[in-house]
UniProtKB/Swiss-Prot annotation:
Binding, Ca(2+) 2: R91, D94, V96, D98, D104, E105
Residue ranges of every copy of the EF-hand domain listed in the record: 209-244, 245-290
Biased composition (Pro residues): 332-343
Protein known as: Glucosidase 2 subunit beta
Amino acid sequence: MLLLLLLLLPLCWAVEVKRPRGVSLSNHHFYEESKPFTCLDGTATIPFDQVNDDYCDCKDGSDEPGTAACPNGSFHCTNTGYKPLYILSSRVNDGVCDCCDGTDEYNSGTVCENTCREKGRKEKESLQQLAEVTREGFRLKKILIEEWKTAREEKQSKLLELQAGKKSLEDQVETLRAAKEEAERPEKEAKDQHRKLWEEQQAAAKARREQERAASAFQELDDNMDGMVSLAELQTHPELDTDGDGALSEEEAQALLSGDTQTDTTSFYDRVWAAIRDKYRSEVPPTDIPVPEETEPKEEKPPVLPPTEEEEEEEEEPEEEEEEEEEEEEAPPPLQPPQPPSPTEDEKMPPYDEETQAIIDAAQEARSKFEEVERSLKEMEESIRSLEQEISFDFGPSGEFAYLYSQCYELTTNEYVYRLCPFKLVSQKPKHGGSPTSLGTWGSWAGPDHDKFSAMKYEQGTGCWQGPNRSTTVRLLCGKETVVTSTTEPSRCEYLMELMTPAACPEPPPEAPSDGDHDEL
């Protein structure tokens, strides 16, 4: 197409056909000077001398192509050496040069420079550059197609290899799973036995400590040390009160002793201790760890003056109050609950014996082997899924877009960095830091029916505030390099991105032989 345009540009050698001003070459046969003129819409026929007489006779304005008489008429710019052009007849002789050859201002007094040759030269250079890009891009496109053919064959071979190896790996997994389960059975039994023995030892130790607490409480309650705890001795501990009046009555004490008046050590532990253990408070104060006093900086005090007689009398009076306070401070300490022994190393489960540890090590080795092969199987299955997806993906008529599959491209603007990962996602993030926002994930090819692979659609991006989810259309343009050239937001939350790629280059027409005699515009 581009070369065809280049061939149409050289018009300097074309034969000039006589026709009224403003008439195109394709319409000259309607304007024969020897015949009356019929309006192009067929509504009227007029003498030929009324064509371009600056009076509008035809409704369609076709009788005044070279004047501004008809508001709906059109003037044809020949623009020899460049592209012909139609302009509104109202713009003829308006003092503005609309045609590059200046023919529209033939009677306005405005002098128009003929710029058609220069415009044609620049147009030709631009088209030649575009044609060169198309040729080079298409050359690269053919390479991309061949590379995908080779890569696809390699991936298919790799897929077959993985699918064949998968069965062998699945068999290994099942074999090692059975070996693991076989090794874990004695491991569980050995661990359970070890824990059971330790828990029994802990229970025995706990019972022993409870007996020691009960014995200690019995000794404290047995004030006369006769080997028996009586009702009176039990009543010395009001905290054992059961009716909430703050005192342990004789009836309450007797109820605690199961109706007896006293109890020995054995009965005390079997019957009494369980009822009082949570309320009982020991008379032995706990050993407090001295807290070091904080030393405050000494303040300089003024010198002490000898007291006056009145001050001496005032100082003598508080002495009695101080003595009373000292007596209160000497009151016996409150009863304390018996202190349970702090946890020791004996309460931690001991290490396994050599035989049990050997069983555990064997089970662990079986687990490690199984997990390693199972992990390899999962990685193989993921590779198979990935290869199947890539091989079956629609990468264009000949797979020319396949090379984009594992790539990402960025475009940095004043505010954002846009990132396109073809066939995966589009995102944007603030240029100066911040989390990315999804502008859509791969949806489908979105070009028109006759050019399906000219655009991509990415959908279901991050939702806009009180709006739809973001989406992006990517237009694919022919270029020698792969680069994102622009990103815009023509509609709210709908983005348009342009990607230059050799894969979008069409096949150019054959180059026409150059004509040395007619190379001027």
